[in-house]
Amino acid sequence: MEMLAYIHFMREKSYQKRVLVWDSGVGGLSIVRALVEQKCGLDIVYYADSRHAPYGDKSVEWLRENVLPCIRQKVEKLSPQIIVLACNTLTASVVEDLRHEYGEDFVVGTEPAIKPATKINKAILLLATPTTYDNCKILRSVEKDIELSRILDVNLASMIERYYDEPKVLDEYLEKLLCDYKSTDMAVVLGCTHYVLVRERIQNILGSGVMLLDGTQGVCNRVIRMLGCNNCECSVELIGNKNVCSVWERYKGA
């Protein structure tokens, strides 16, 4: 059952531009925190669609049929200036549908930081879901020019969702997942917003010399280009279950 779990930095909203940030759970909090740190002066409404979580093991057709109607409903209710799809899988699956319906400048997607990675290293390790990998247009545009390795895991996002506050469980799972890539010379792309929440844990396992990249800052930069930045605190409302509030309390100051 959805609930208003948290209100952060609340101030007079009549002066703020509203942004709807959408994810299946806690992953998109990485983007919310980045926007808050930029002091964009935005009214951020974060919607955690736990009813349909996780997205990572769903097909494009399933996401279109089940998630798109929910997005349309919330857009109509909340009237945001823009919506941020804070999920690589959802972006790869439905971003074109939403842009066709609402316009190019209404929808900001989240995509793996493949292009920035290619400027650093032509050998890339992608951590993502199978649906993201299969439907990522940016990846298709550069794949022939890079040496790509991939870890396509459908369970890691759910593990982070469930065990964010239990580091031992998460570390054991990450260790098994990443053990073959310790001290790798490849650039490592975190192709899921959930993974950004445990970026430091991934870094510790792979080694301090391994370059990690994700799309968080790119999303923030686009939001700022579209809506501006007035050096004021953001207001943040979280709509989701208690876990979203709990993770935000820990992650926002990490």
Where is each model-derived feature located?
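Non-catalytic structural scaffold of enzyme domains
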Residues: L4-A254
